[in-house]
């Protein structure tokens, strides 16, 4: 009995978890939030290829490139932190201008001293990964214009399209934000017949593009945070090129029907083939019931991914994904369309989201029962056949025993 008591006491001592107490007796203990990682080294995945070039005094968001691959939201034991390369302290420290929301680091407003390399670190109980993002903050002067501008190209004598980029987080957080377009210092108002609204405030159409339309454009969005308004400026350099031989874009995905489960996160890529060799000015976007995605879903439940252009075996492709987070029943009755357009041709492909059947299948559940019935039926038939054969043999024997044979001559 004494030996049994010693064994039980020893096992309980080894299995009791270590806890950190808050210091108040009335409060329950909480476990330490720092995950255990084998070794203290993180695997560095490299630097994000795109640097963030922003203006001083404006809001800035830095996205962690590891987030789409880490599935942070689905695990309560995963952690994502931010730090600056020249500092060992984690962000936000005591800096009221910086905070972390999900996988995004917010800086509001940005100052030139914020320029530098930022490290996002993803940890869980089994591994640790890091990637870096470069931020450069410039003064809002004419001299900084070439450094902070996005290059966009339009073909001569065609309908040009300007896109105000990198506003996803601000639009979803500020549904009432207004966007105004400027060419140089001139406001492009609704009365201007050459510049037309595309139905989406982040896009501007240029009717019959000419060489005079080349130059610098600005799109300015008003963003309100804690009752204070901030301007978010994106500068665009438009270059107009003469008509060239453009390839006809061929949309090779998605399928006409996309299976999905309600409540799940869904990514539908629109992949467009652009031919071989030469580069292309093809633009790809998504529509929902003939409405731009940002206008159809101002809260950001459905969004467009980045415009990704790449090559495979000397073949050029461009890809833009449609991201559902999450899928709802409304999506089952929505006509989604991927559009690929360049000066030579415009192509589109419709697709719909279809709810997949439940993971529980009656055919699978009834399969064992059907097998049992089949086996029992086979056994019953076998026994029945044996009984019939036995009865036939008995009757034959009985008739043979009772048959009268003619007597022998003797």
From Swiss-Prot:
GO terms for molecular function: interleukin-1 binding; interleukin-1 receptor activity; interleukin-1, type II, blocking receptor activity. A soluble form (sIL1R2) can also be produced by proteolytic cleavage at the cell surface (shedding) involving a metalloproteinase. It is a single-pass type I membrane protein. The chain crosses the membrane at residues 356-381. Gene3D superfamilies: Immunoglobulins. Residues 35-136, 146-237, 249-357 form the Ig-like C2-type domain. Glycans are attached at residues 124, 208, 231, 289. PROSITE patterns: IG_LIKE. GO terms for biological process: negative regulation of cytokine production involved in inflammatory response; negative regulation of interleukin-1 alpha production; negative regulation of interleukin-1-mediated signaling pathway; negative regulation of protein processing; protein processing. GO terms for cellular component: cytoplasm; extracellular region; plasma membrane. The keyword Isomerase does not apply. Keywords: Cell membrane, Disulfide bond, Glycoprotein, Immunoglobulin domain, Membrane, Receptor, Repeat, Secreted, Signal, Transmembrane, Transmembrane helix. Residues 14-355 are extracellular. It holds the Pfam family ig. Disulfide bonds join 42-128, 64-120, 164-219, 270-338. Belongs to the interleukin-1 receptor family. Non-signaling receptor for IL1A, IL1B and IL1RN. Reduces IL1B activities. Serves as a decoy receptor by competitive binding to IL1B and preventing its binding to IL1R1. Also modulates cellular response through non-signaling association with IL1RAP after binding to IL1B. IL1R2 (membrane and secreted forms) preferentially binds IL1B and poorly IL1A and IL1RN. The secreted IL1R2 recruits secreted IL1RAP with high affinity; this complex formation may be the dominant mechanism for neutralization of IL1B by secreted/soluble receptors. PANTHER family: INTERLEUKIN-1 RECEPTOR FAMILY MEMBER (PTHR11890), INTERLEUKIN-1 RECEPTOR TYPE 2 (PTHR11890:SF3). Associates with IL1RAP to form a non-signaling interleukin-1 receptor complex. This is Interleukin-1 receptor type 2.
């Amino acid at each position: 009995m004494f030996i049994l008591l010693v064994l039980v006491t020893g096992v309980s001592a080894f299995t009791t978890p270590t806890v950190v107490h808050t210091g108040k007796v009335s409060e329950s203990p909480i476990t330490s939030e720092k995950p255990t990682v084998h070794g203290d080294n993180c695997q560095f995945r490299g630097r994000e290829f795109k640097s963030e070039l922003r203006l001083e005094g404006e809001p800035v968001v830095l996205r962690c490139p590891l987030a789409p691959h880490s599935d942070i939201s689905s695990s309560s034991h995963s952690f994502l932190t931010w730090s600056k390369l020249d500092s060992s302290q984690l962000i936000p420290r005591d800096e009221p201008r910086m905070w972390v929301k999900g996988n995004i680091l917010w800086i509001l407003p940005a100052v030139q001293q914020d320029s530098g390399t930022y490290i996002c670190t993803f940890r869980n109980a089994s591994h640790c990964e890091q990637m870096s993002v470069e931020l450069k903050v410039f003064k809002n002067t004419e001299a900084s214009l070439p450094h902070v501008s996005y290059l966009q190209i339009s073909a001569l004598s065609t309908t040009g399209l300007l896109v105000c980029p990198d506003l996803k987080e601000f639009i979803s957080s500020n549904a009432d934000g207004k966007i105004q377009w400027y060419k140089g210092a001139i406001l492009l108002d609704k009365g201007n017949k050459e510049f037309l609204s595309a139905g989406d405030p982040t896009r501007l159409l240029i009717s019959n593009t000419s060489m005079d339309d080349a130059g610098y454009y600005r799109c300015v969005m008003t963003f309100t945070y804690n009752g204070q308004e901030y301007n978010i400026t994106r500068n665009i350099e438009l270059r107009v090129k003469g008509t060239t031989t453009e390839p006809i874009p061929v949309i090779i995905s998605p399928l006409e029907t996309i299976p999905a489960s309600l409540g799940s996160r869904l990514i539908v890529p629109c992949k467009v083939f652009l031919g071989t060799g030469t580069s292309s000015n093809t633009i790809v976007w998504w529509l929902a019931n003939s409405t731009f995605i940002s206008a159809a879903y101002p809260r950001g439940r459905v969004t467009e991914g980045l415009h990704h252009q790449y090559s495979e075996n000397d073949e050029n492709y461009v890809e833009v994904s449609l991201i559902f987070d999450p899928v709802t029943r409304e999506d089952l009755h929505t006509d989604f369309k991927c559009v690929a357009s360049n000066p030579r041709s415009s192509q589109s492909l419709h697709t719909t989201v279809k709810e997949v059947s439940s993971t529980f299948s009656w055919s699978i559940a009834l399969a064992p029962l059907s097998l049992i019935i089949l086996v029992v039926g086979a056994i019953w038939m076998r026994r029945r056949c044996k009984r019939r054969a036995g009865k036939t043999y008995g009757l034959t024997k009985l008739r043979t025993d009772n048959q009268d044979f003619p007597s022998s001559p003797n």
